[in-house]
Amino acid sequence: MNKKTIVVKFGTSTLTQGSPKLNSPHMMEIVRQIAQLHNDGFRIVIVTSGAIAAGRHYLNHPQLPPTIASKQLLAAVGQSQLIQAWEKLFAIYDIHIGQLLLTRADIEDRERFLNARDTLHALLDNHIIPVINENDAVATAEIKVGDNDNLSALVAILVQAEQLYLLTDQQGLFDSDPRKNPEAKLIPVVEQITDHIRSIAGGSGTNLGTGGMMTKIIAADVATRSGIETIIAPGNRPNVIADLAYEQNIGTKFIAHQSDRLESRKQWLFAAPSAGIITIDNGAQNAILEQNKSLLPAGIINVEGRFSRGEVVKIRTQSGKDIALGMPRYNSDALQLIKGRKSADIENVLGYEYGAVAMHRDDMIILS
């Protein structure tokens, strides 16, 4: 049975449990749940905060000015401590992890997007759990409130996840600030993220991390618009991850816009002018339009323009009609060499391969 793909984002407050350092017993409990789901067949991706807190603790809480450079220093020192903590705990269950350090630019740049996506899918296909963090040590503008909330939404789109869990120190989204109003009520389900929902999100957060409730609402908006159900839930609740995966009602659930699932992803992917043209034969045209298939090198007749792997190009028929936009797996130089050839010849011709297809069907949008 194919189980769903879930992205789980852990805020600093969840990993530290209010202390100035990573809370190992709590992380052990988190890993136990993820190991259970992993062994049950779920595909789990972790987006982890905590590098800055880990770095501050490792350096014995140095007095540093509140600057970008100070945060980068702490992140550079703390990232190795953070990944070691995850690695040691997963090793108890004989589960391997793979670290990816990303910035938003890595996902917005199409060639790097493809590389990141291929790496993530390779890890998941080989039963390795990806552990992702913002590359705070080299990022500049990216170090701001909500980095990993927003990053987790983009990662969820990247891996085509069914669900995104944003685990935090709050029970979910309330109709007012529960720390100020004891009568505040938890909102169990949000059908649509409206201005009213944004207005009640407030500005919660701790000085250990960089996140708050408003950034989670923004992340939920991005994810649900791409067809990904998003849940804000308490990271300290016993068995919260496993219970969410098995569909218990916890926290605040943001309903996915299922009708827009594929289209919104493609709008996100293809918001760029075309960099070239790939002309295809009648067989490839039929495969794409009638059979919903990917484009193989054998079906390519001509390649126009100079473009990189992952840039948007037009797919044109022999009669001159543009039938699709898409992101090729290979750059223009490589496609010139493999056009008209069988997929089995790719590695022999190029000396490498990014798979058997020139352009995957998931990376195309058909033009009406």
Curated annotation (Swiss-Prot):
Residues 275-353 form the PUA domain. It is found in: Cytoplasm. It catalyses: L-glutamate + ATP = L-glutamyl 5-phosphate + ADP. GO terms for molecular function: ATP binding; glutamate 5-kinase activity; RNA binding. GO terms for biological process: L-proline biosynthetic process. SUPFAM superfamilies: Carbamate kinase-like (SSF53633), PUA domain-like (SSF88697). The keyword Nucleotide-binding applies. SMART domains: PUA. Pfam families: AA_kinase (PF00696), PUA (PF01472). PROSITE patterns: GLUTAMATE_5_KINASE (PS00902), PUA (PS50890). One of its GO terms (cellular component) is cytosol. Belongs to the glutamate 5-kinase family. This is Glutamate 5-kinase. It comes from Haemophilus influenzae (strain PittEE). The lineage of its organism: Bacteria, Pseudomonadati, Pseudomonadota, Gammaproteobacteria, Pasteurellales.
